[in-house]
């Protein structure tokens, strides 16, 4: 139907896609080194892109970044590596349906934690930790899909601390970080707060460049 805004998919409006910038970048890549641009790359991703992402997140080395086929694949790769049947996994309630389907296929035990206006209920998460070990917590920190909330900075610190103490991984699933309304950016990433190597961050260029490029990272 004309003039209908569809909420069925989390896709940017076509008029927001930077078509001219993508066209120029593609032309430059082909002009600078078309053989490399059109050949097989390395499995971890383009070295220049990995270095750019590492620098953006304050990481010491580009080899701490893996380029993926969107952020959903990043999550799938992480889950298949870390999780097995029966592992207790914290999920926000509500959460992104496709992520829940991937976790269900693995056979994890869901530990649903309700969302508040400033993100996940950390008190409820701490209560869940008292009931048994958690293997992973899946968190969408910014402009949550589908709830729309953003995790407060105070709660980010409160989440990072017990991850180290109780030895569980926080999967910071953050494809919407670059989409704030207004001039105020979202709070710092949990990755930047992590001192115990318990936060794994994923994001995507599907919302800012184009869904069709299918480029994300872990």
Question: What annotation goes with each model-predicted range?
Answer:
Residues 191-218:
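Active-site PLP attachment segment
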Residues 17-21, 182-184, 212-214:
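Short aromatic-enriched loop/helix-cap "lid" or pocket-rim segments at secondary-structure transitions
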Residues 36-167, 178-196, 200:
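Conserved core of the PLP fold type I
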Residues 10-13, 141-145, 207:
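Short glycine-rich anion-binding loops that position phosphate/pyrophosphate groups of nucleotides
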Residues 1-44, 168:
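N-terminal "arm"/small-domain region of PLP-dependent enzymes with the aminotransferase-like
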Residues 9-11, 71, 149, 213, ...:
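Gly/Ser/Thr-rich helix-start
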């Amino acid at each position: 139907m004309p003039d209908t805004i569809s909420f069925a998919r989390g896709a940017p409006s076509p008029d927001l896609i930077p078509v001219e910038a993508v066209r120029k970048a593609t032309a430059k890549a082909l002009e600078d080194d078309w053989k490399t641009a059109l050949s097989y790359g390395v499995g971890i991703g383009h070295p220049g892109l990995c270095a750019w992402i590492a620098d953006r997140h304050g990481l010491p080395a580009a080899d701490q970044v893996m380029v993926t086929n969107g952020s959903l694949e990043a999550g799938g790769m992480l889950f298949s590596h870390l999780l097995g049947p029966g592992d207790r996994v914290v999920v926000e309630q509500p959460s992104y349906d496709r992520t829940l389907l991937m976790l269900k296929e693995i056979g994890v035990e869901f530990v649903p934690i309700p969302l508040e206006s400033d993100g996940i209920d950390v008190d409820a998460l701490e209560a869940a930790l008292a009931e048994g070990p958690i293997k992973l917590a899946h968190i969408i920190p910014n402009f949550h899909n589908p709830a729309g909330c953003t995790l407060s900075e105070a709660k980010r610190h409160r989440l990072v601390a017990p991850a180290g103490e109780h030895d569980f991984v926080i999967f910071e699933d953050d494809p919407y970080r670059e989409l704030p309304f207004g001039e105020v950016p979202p709070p710092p990433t949990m990755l930047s707060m992590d001192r115990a190597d318990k936060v794994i961050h994923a994001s995507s260029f599907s919302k800012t460049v184009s869904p069709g490029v299918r480029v994300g990272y872990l």
